[in-house]
Amino acid sequence: MKQTLLSLSNLTKQFDGKKVLDSLDLDIFDGEFITLLGPSGCGKTTLLRMMAGFEHPDDGTIALGDQDLTHTPPEHRPLNTVFQNYALFPHMSVFDNVAYGLKMEKRPKQEIRERVEDALAMVQLEDFARRKPHQLSGGQQQRVAIARAVVKRPKVLLLDEPLSALDYKLRRTMQVELKRLQRELGITFVFVTHDQEEALSMSDRVVVLKDGLIQQLGTPREVYERPANLFTARFVGETNFFPGRVDKANGDDTITVDVFGLKRTFRKPDFPVSGGQSLHVLLRPEDIRVLAPDDEDGVAGKIVERNYKGSTLDSVIHLEDGTEVLASEFFDEDDPTFDYRLGEPVKVSWVDGWEWLLPTEPEALPEEEGTDA
């Protein structure tokens, strides 16, 4: 049984009359890596700042175990924050940056030295203690910021998009390092990002936010493979949306659905369905199978774009009714026919059971612009 460490209850916040958080409830477990994921303006940064104490809710409470933190100043909360710009003191050495918080608490010199050395060892920077921040790479600066945060032994570490300034390769490396560090420390990590790949690869659970409301809370696999609504399906990864119409409900917890004129048998979804009902059939690009044009199975179309990415071949296919299909297939270097020409006719199919069904309720696309909140 997982134990709740940080409890957020009915949190509400408005800026200039607009609700940024709307009666939000969230329990964060002891020792988990949880990510707040969403587009700009969804409320994820405001929520993190509330946990840290830099913002106060208009309504609701924040509790750490039995301790009410709602109005506790940031410096008195057993939570530390790693900011996007790291906020290192440029005139101080790595050692002094990490030791700063302990010195402010007037800890004994011996204790400070031991704890700083331990923290630097955790982030593999013990040989860099005398360097200044400008002598470090971006990844090393980030690790110093993490060491400075964990040296005070917080119960929760809050990370506000700490990887966004790093290049792609270093960002991938630091994703692995952060997860390793979190496991070794056993500290609860609350991570904020708009990057779906980061959220899926690092988290124990993901909170998908939109307009100050939780759209879905679950494991990365649940969020990706079984999105709760159209917003989550669109925002987390790429998705093909096929129009389906229920032909009939079968007697074995399955339904027959007409998709592009094909009768496919699907598992009955969690929402009520009846004959003639329209619904969305969701398939990720990696679920799509591209077949030869004379194959008996599948829907006819043609290749309009292809991108070789080393391990995968990504294709865009236009079906005869104009529907655009994204397909991502693992590249088979032993198959000389595994490639496509632009304009080449193909058929599109998938394995029954790989699809996910959602009702055809109207849902706005995620906004790409706006000030993050």
UniProtKB/Swiss-Prot annotation:
Broad class of where this protein is predominantly found: membrane
The keyword Transport appears for this protein: yes
Highest taxon of source: Bacteria
List of residues binding ATP: 38-45
Disulfide bonding pattern of the chain: none
Entry EC no(s): 7.6.2.11
One GO CC term on file: ATP-binding cassette (ABC) transporter complex
Signal sequence bounds: none
Lipid bilayer topology: Peripheral membrane protein
Pfam families membership: ABC_tran, TOBE_2
Keyword terms: ATP-binding, Cell inner membrane, Cell membrane, Membrane, Nucleotide-binding, Translocase, Transport
Catalytic activity: ATP + H2O + polyamine-[polyamine-binding protein]Side 1 = ADP + phosphate + polyamineSide 2 + [polyamine-binding protein]Side 1
MF term (GO), any: ATP hydrolysis activity
Location of this chain's protein in the cell: Cell inner membrane
Domain ABC transporter: 6-236
Family: Belongs to the ABC transporter superfamily. Spermidine/putrescine importer (TC 3.A.1.11.1) family.
Function: Part of the ABC transporter complex PotABCD involved in spermidine/putrescine import. Responsible for energy coupling to the transport system.
Self-association state and partner proteins as the record states: The complex is composed of two ATP-binding proteins (PotA), two transmembrane proteins (PotB and PotC) and a solute-binding protein (PotD).
PANTHER family named among the record's database cross-references: SPERMIDINE/PUTRESCINE IMPORT ATP-BINDING PROTEIN POTA, SPERMIDINE_PUTRESCINE IMPORT ATP-BINDING PROTEIN POTA
Stated name of the protein: Spermidine/putrescine import ATP-binding protein PotA
Name of the coding gene: potA
